[in-house]
Structures are given as C-alpha cells and as structure tokens.
C-alpha cells in the first residue's frame, strides 16, 4: 500500500488562467455565475510560470500543475500549456509536470505529452448520480471520458473528488468505485470550503467526517497516492497529523487556485514535525 512509506509527495499548483469560467459548478469560485471576489486574469507569462516552478522546486515540490479555468482544452489553450510545459522542461528542474485544463480529446492530450506534460488531472468530483445537483453545464460522463482519454494518450492520470457538497456516503462510495476503475496514479482529495457567494450551504465537514472520507478512499484505492488538497487547513487547522495517519501521502504545497494556503516552508516544517519527509522522486 502507498501509505507504508514515510515519504510525502509535494505538489504545487500554478493557476495560469483564473476566473470567468462559463461552467456553473456550485462549489467553484472561478465560475462566472456567482460573482465571487477573486483575482481574474488570462494567461500568466511563461517566464513567470517558470519562475514559480523554480521557487516551489526549491521548497521540495516534485509535481507542478498548470491549471486553467474554463470548460475544455481548446486549441489556443492547448498551445499555451504546451509552451509553458516545454519551458519548464528546458529549465531542467526535475519536476513532474501536470496539466489540469478541463475536458480534452486524445489528440490534444498527446500533443501536451510531446511537449513535456507528464500527467493530466481531471477530477470526477462526486458520484454520477449526485453530479447534476452541483453542475448543469456539463456532465459527469464527460469527465469520465476525459479521464479515459488521458489513459489512451498514455499520460499519467490524476483524478479525485471533493467532499462536503451535500453528497451522501453512498455517493462517496460510488465516486471511489469509479476511481477504482480508472486506477489513477494520484487521487486529489478536497474538502469543500464554504463561501457566501456560492449557492451551496455554508457548512464545513467536521474533522472526524473528513478523516472517515480519507480512510474510505484509502480502503478503495490502496495503491493510489492520496493527495490532500483544498480544504485541509479549513477543516483541520494546525492539527493535520491524523490525515497522514489515515493514509494521505501527498500534499498540495502552498496556495490553491483562489484560496491561500500555508507558506511552503511552513508546510514542509509541519510534515517533518510529524515524522515524515518530502519524497525525492515521483515513484
């Protein structure tokens, strides 16, 4: 099982294009439907992206994820991400480059691979049955198909979900069963962060329920890296050790897409204080 090692994989997120997404995902501050107070911008400069990659690598990050708002990996976006990935590879930082750019076809994903992208992240988010309650502008089936396309393109797959949207335990189990089918090398696990501008209830999972979600994920995905992402600070505060004891072996380092995280050095110090060390390779 993945949790046997005391190594924690550190991954950082680079929000290269933020906000004004046409999709209506009720949990997402980047949706243009809800008027959330976030930074909105199009396409960071390639130089800035490479500099962020260098900085996070110095803190121990092995993964670097290029994230864009929007429904899909259309041609202009694909070209931009390919250029960014190629520039990072040329910098010879030893990073595992991940792209997270919405729905994508096989040819576009293959193009990213030829330009330096190692893996693609596309989360199922929740069960097929519950998904229409949180998004109406695209389907769960589209998400699953993009994950299948990622595997067909011979890219590594990251796929996970978000807990605390109002889903049942049955929904959580169905999500994990479908992730079992896909067998991603990494599954990002998020906890919903309540936001008064979003249409979901203003409630946060209790630490106990969140831990039960992690334990369940480890049971269904024994050989998958479980990466804790958004919501860990909101739910667990400064007592995050139980997450690692429950089977988490990957952490998103630093800030999230539109939410501040801890300073990277503080995350690293916290992990080391629990008796874990930053992984030094991706395997």
From Swiss-Prot:
Pathway(s) annotated for this protein in UniProt: Cofactor biosynthesis; biotin biosynthesis; biotin from 7,8-diaminononanoate: step 2/2
Positions bound to [2Fe-2S] cluster: 65, 100, 225
Similarity remark: Belongs to the radical SAM superfamily. Biotin synthase family.
Gene Ontology biological-process entries: biotin biosynthetic process
Cofactor(s) needed: [4Fe-4S] cluster; [2Fe-2S] cluster
Protein keywords: 2Fe-2S, 4Fe-4S, Biotin biosynthesis, Iron, Iron-sulfur, Metal-binding, S-adenosyl-L-methionine, Transferase
Protein name per its UniProtKB record: Biotin synthase
Organism name: Helicobacter hepaticus (strain ATCC 51449 / 3B1)
């Amino acid at each position: 099982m993945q949790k046997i090692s005391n190594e924690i994989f550190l991954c950082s997120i680079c929000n290269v294009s933020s906000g004004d997404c046409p999709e209506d995902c009720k949990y997402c501050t980047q949706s243009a439907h809800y008027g959330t107070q976030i930074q909105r911008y199009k396409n960071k400069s390639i130089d800035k992206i490479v500099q962020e990659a260098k900085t996070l690598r110095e803190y121990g990050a092995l993964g670097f994820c290029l994230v864009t708002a929007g429904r899909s990996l259309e041609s202009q976006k694909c070209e931009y991400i390919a250029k960014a990935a190629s520039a990072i590879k040329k910098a010879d930082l030893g990073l595992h480059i991940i792209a997270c750019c919405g729905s994508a076809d096989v040819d576009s994903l293959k193009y990213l691979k030829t330009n330096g992208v190692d893996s693609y992240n596309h989360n199922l988010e929740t069960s097929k049955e519950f998904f229409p309650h949180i998004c109406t502008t695209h389907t769960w089936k589209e998400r699953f198909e993009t994950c299948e396309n990622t595997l067909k393109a011979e890219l590594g797959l990251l796929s996970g979900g978000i807990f605390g949207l109002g889903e049942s335990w049955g929904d959580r189990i169905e999500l994990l069963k479908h992730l079992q089918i896909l067998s991603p090398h990494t599954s990002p696990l998020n906890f919903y962060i309540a936001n008064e501008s979003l249409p979901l209830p203003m409630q946060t999972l209790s630490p106990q329920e969140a831990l039960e979600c992690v334990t369940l994920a480890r049971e269904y995905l024994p050989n998958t890296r479980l990466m804790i992402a958004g919501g860990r600070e909101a739910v667990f505060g400064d007592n995050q050790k139980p997450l690692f004891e429950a089977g988490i072996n990957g952490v998103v380092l630093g800030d999230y897409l539109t939410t501040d995280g801890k300073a990277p050095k503080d995350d690293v110090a916290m992990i080391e204080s629990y008796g874990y060390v930053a992984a030094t390779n991706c395997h």
